[in-house]
Amino acid sequence: MSRRRKHGDSSGLKQTPRKAMATEEGSLVFESGKRRLRAARGSGPQGPGERPPRPLPQQEQPPVAASCRKSNTEERYETPKRMLQMDLLSSTFSSPNDPDGQNDIFWDQNSPMTKQLDKGRKKQLYTTDSDEISHIVNRIAPQDEKPTTDSMLGVWIGDTAIPCTPSVAKGKSRTKLSCTKLKSQNQEEELMKLAKQFDKNMEELDVIQEQDKRNHDLIQMISEAETSLNCRDNVQMQLLCDTVPEIDKALLKKPVKENTKISVVNDQTSSQKPFDQNAEAAFIAMFDGSTQKCSGQLSQDLSDSFLKTSNTTFGKKNTLKEEKIITNESVVTENLPSKTLGSLSHQVDNPGMTKSYVTFCTKEPGTFNKHIDTFTTSDFEDDWENLLSNEPFVMQNIETSELFPAPKTIQIADQKEMCSFNSKEAKSKSGMNKSVDVKLRDSKILQGLPSNTWNNELTDAEKYRFSPKPNDKPNKLSTTGNKMKLEKSFNIVVNQDKIQDCAVASNLTKVNEDTHTKFNCKVNASEKKSALKPGCSNKSIFNQSLKVPANVKPFGSATLGSTTSVCNPDQTNGSKLGSFFDDWNDPSFTNEIVKACHQLENSWEADDVDDDILYQACDDIERLTQEQNIRVDSKTSESVLEINNSSKHGAKNVFTTPKQGSQFMQSKHLNLNSISAQTSSLANSLQINKSVKMERGEMYGNSPGFLGATTNLSIYSKNSDCQISNLHVSCNNPDVPKQVNSSKSVLTGSSSLNVGSHHMSTEIAASKNRLSTLHLSKSTTRGKAQSDLNRAVRLSEYVFTKMKNCPMLSPFNNSSVTGSISDTKIAQGLEKNKTVNPLPGKAVQQQPLVKFSEPLKQPSKEEEEKNRKCSPEEIQRKRQAALIRRMAKAQASSVKKGR
């Protein structure tokens, strides 16, 4: 290559300018073909000949050599043409068949490059190594370089974007398709195998069915033999059923203290159907052992199967012990005989009746008579009794023979667990607030009810209509899925467990307008003997009722239909907390209640935060009420309801606020010298938020609680359509009592109510479809009373007036001083949005407790500490004493009735 370079240089020296121009024309051809590097190579050997001063060294060459160079130069002119043809064949410089091109690229790195200028002039350009290398690289493989973009979108969007490689996707799809075809072929083969296996199994099944048919024939022969025995048992059972009522009465006199009767269905009253032999054989084949007693159950009618099952049990075990068990646990079907004392019959063909009821009755203290289906065995019956004792919907009606000699019947619905009861009051004794629950707690209430109480009836789902009836007559309960028809003497408990729908009609009289409800009842504390009655229910506790708003849907709107005290404990916590009332002098409690009281004592003693919150709330409200200077003398006129609930001791009470979270609130060791009242508001709608507004605008929660202790609390209700004028209200009901405050006669509604209670909770209910809730406003004195009454309030109102000098039969009335009255305004409703404070959902400490008390003599801290320390011991002592008394009376009564 070095020799060729020298040869090229020497030949270039002998070039004439004309020949150099021809070479330039060849180089222009290369440049037009974008072969600048080739043009540089072609002009490189001739470059020195471009300059005219260079011919001086050419003369030094010998002439022979000059002729050789001349011939070589002519051959050299043809070289670019040959290279051009090679370049046309190979479009790139990367061809390995072009050694000259490769040599020129790498060998002549420092050679000058010529560039055509205007008018044929040349300019020699000198480039560095880095520039040539970058130029060469860009010419060799420019398509491999991708411009760098600031955003990653440039990789996928634009002219230089990477394609989406559809070929790869197609390849994958073809692969999947081939796999699918392969799988489909395999599935066909598998289906053929399965079909063959199925044929084999069917052949085996035919053999098995033939064997089963032979076995069935054998079983049918055995069943026919047993059927003949059952016929004999039925004949014996027919004789036994004639003596069942006498056995039942004889057995019930011993454990039950004339407060419960069992409705026994006579076999003669219902038609007997023979057992289905095929069903009998099928059950014998399915079951073995003692479970064969339930044969024929599933293929028969409900009531007939109950009777036949009890017949079978009677027939197979003819001992006296079995007769007692069946009598104590006899099946009560839907057909209750009308001759049963204390209850009217539930007819199966009643169009309003959609659920079957089971009648429960109470035994001696400590046990229950649970009437369950007797198609189960004796072992399972024992377990079922244990289960029923723990079930939250099981209710117990307890009553003493001294107070209520008439029997009671409790009827419980299974499906929705609606619990209600029919009660009959004694002719000589006055009725009282009755509620039932398996686990009654240790609280104390004294309530008296005169004999002229009212029975009520809930007849419409949207309207409450109440008709008074003599309380000597027995009561009737008929219910549907969403409508309750209630007739009862004082308080009625309706429990629906899962759907917290409660409809309560209590102590209400019929008003002239259907849309209004007046609550007319009277309780006197003087009748303490007839007032000692526990009032508890598993889900709904109704102690006193104020008013039922108009157009209330009891079940459809999922709200409480009457303004009563309602406690809806959660099902899981129902065994621990609830609103419970008890009087330890009442001998009708059972040992079960005493055990429950002991269990509840631990939770009370362990929770001291509630006491602190209660005392703090009481102190704050007492301080606010004492700062009020508006006081007038008052006279108490006759009122429709006067409740004097007084307790000898500061017994513990658990009040439950039935919001959706089923929150619980405990109030313990109430101050005997102070008054507090609790009003629970039940509404299954978050849109109804009630608020308590003090005179100074202090909020205590939307569901205020009043726990009354010593002073009277006068509550006056106003119908929703009554317009209050300055000093009077026009009402169509002539029976509305009047409340006289000083010299001003104020008529504040169709019903009024004086409440002075120690443990009394009042429930104001609101319906979901009617957002106009009850407003609690005050009927105060002089100018402020007029200003409040001037407002035309369409929503129903309750006026709370606390009277210091009110005749009460209360042992704590000595701390009340006569002569003055303090009025406190409570505003409750949706219109008072500025005072709305939603009820706390979780914390028990934040439950609203509003205590209205203004005794002249404030209780000292020492007295409070003393009451707080002594109340648990007193309760324990009373429990022990009550337990001893109950056991003694139970034994005495059992001995007396056994004779």
UniProtKB/Swiss-Prot annotation:
One of its GO terms (molecular function) is protein serine/threonine kinase activator activity. Signal peptide: none annotated. It comes from the Eukaryota. Residues 71-81, 859-877 have a biased composition (Basic and acidic residues). Its main location: nucleus. The keyword Ion transport does not apply. Residues 180-210 form a coiled coil. GO terms for cellular component: cytosol; nuclear replication fork; nuclear speck; plasma membrane. Residues 1-82, 833-899 are annotated as: Disordered. GO terms for biological process: DNA damage response; DNA repair; mitotic G2/M transition checkpoint; positive regulation of protein serine/threonine kinase activity; regulation of DNA damage checkpoint; replication fork processing. There is a cross-link at residues 416, 444, 485, 539 (Glycyl lysine isopeptide (Lys-Gly) (interchain with G-Cter in SUMO2)). A motif (ATR-activation domain (AAD)) lies at residues 105-111. It is found in: Nucleus. PANTHER family: EWING'S TUMOR-ASSOCIATED ANTIGEN 1 (PTHR16434:SF2), EWING'S TUMOR-ASSOCIATED ANTIGEN 1 ETAA1 (PTHR16434). Replication stress response protein that accumulates at DNA damage sites and promotes replication fork progression and integrity. Recruited to stalled replication forks via interaction with the RPA complex and directly stimulates ATR kinase activity independently of TOPBP1. Probably only regulates a subset of ATR targets. The RBM1 (RPA1-binding, also named RPA70N-binding) motif mediates interaction with RPA1. The RBM2 (RPA2-binding, also named RPA32C-binding) motif mediates interaction with RPA2. This is Ewing's tumor-associated antigen 1 homolog. It comes from Bos taurus. The gene is ETAA1.
